[in-house]
Amino acid sequence: MIEIKKMKGGVCAARGFVAGASGCGIKNGKVMRDDVAVVFSESPATSAATFTTNKVKAAPVRISAEHLKAGANRAVILNSGNANACTGENGLKDARTMCADTAGLLGLKPKEVLVCSTGRIGVPMPMDRVAKGIAALKPSRNGSAACAAAIMTSDTFAKEYAVEVKTSKGSFRVGGIAKGAGMIDPNMATMLCVLTTDAAIPQPTLRAELKRSVANSFNRITIDGDMSTNDTVILLANGLSACSPDMSAFSQALDEVTRALARMIVSDGEGVSRFVEVEVTGAANDKEARTAAEAIANSTLVKCAWSGGDPNWGRILDAVGYCGVKVDDTTADIFYDKLALVKNGIAAQTPFEKLRAVAAKKSFKVTVDLKLGNGSYYVWTTDLTEEYVRLNLGE
């Protein structure tokens, strides 16, 4: 019997983890809010991470991947306001310095520290200010919320989540913080996430579990189809619960946390007014289902229709048709929640006002059944509003 219960504490919910934040004015020299944060395991830990698939990788991504090889990382240093991306050799040096300064603060070796940055691309990191910010960090068991707030950029709220799991083998906890609101597309984008657990998990298993869970959460979200240079998801495990759970229990707990954080990111998308789950079923295979679902979710015309509360199914079927998957437009069905828009490729007889009422909701589901095979895939996405355009006009 497995009992999973939501709890407070974010990354500090798991035993032996502390976090903290400080402000140093990274973006413009003015200390308006916290913009440096740290998550730290007070005991030895194992680690796993996944990074952006963008071929243009930021310096912190490269340094973290290098430090991850040892698999014994205990701390993550994070900053907002500057991505440290496309900054050349100096950027790599700065990322290493951030790890070294953090290691000095916490009594670690530099390679025990991973580094994450988010913010503007192509701007040198103001290391004099960053050094002061790191020196001012005072991690505590109550620091998760401040840490989550410090890594926000265009986010409108801090994102944290944690669960406690009770099993026949004992109890353990999993928690996390995340940021992200724009440049969100499958394979992660402009999103950072740090996860912690006090479960005792061997490192090879930890890495496999993180990869699997990310595939079913953060890689299922898309807001604007753009992919960042800085995506990072990190999982630290210190085993302090003395519980070595069955993998089914750990998988369920990890998935609850990653999926909750992923949904928060989509809900907080720039200018978002609607959260939409898009599921394609009956595709020739899962790969084609994914292609079709992502085509619908990233279609500008579809997203604009959602913004206006318009159940325009023609744009949905059009997106499926141009994305390259097998489709028979004489058999496809489309549903908004459980109301049929299309049956066998033609308009269903559902009253328009009922369909419009669903499309006007803050959250609804679009299902497309291609009736060609057993392939299925879902993604979480949003509408596209004038506010999104305003937020991305530039400075």
Regions found by a protein language model. Give the residues of each.
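Generic structural marker for isolated residues within well-ordered, non-membrane alpha-helices
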Residues: 99
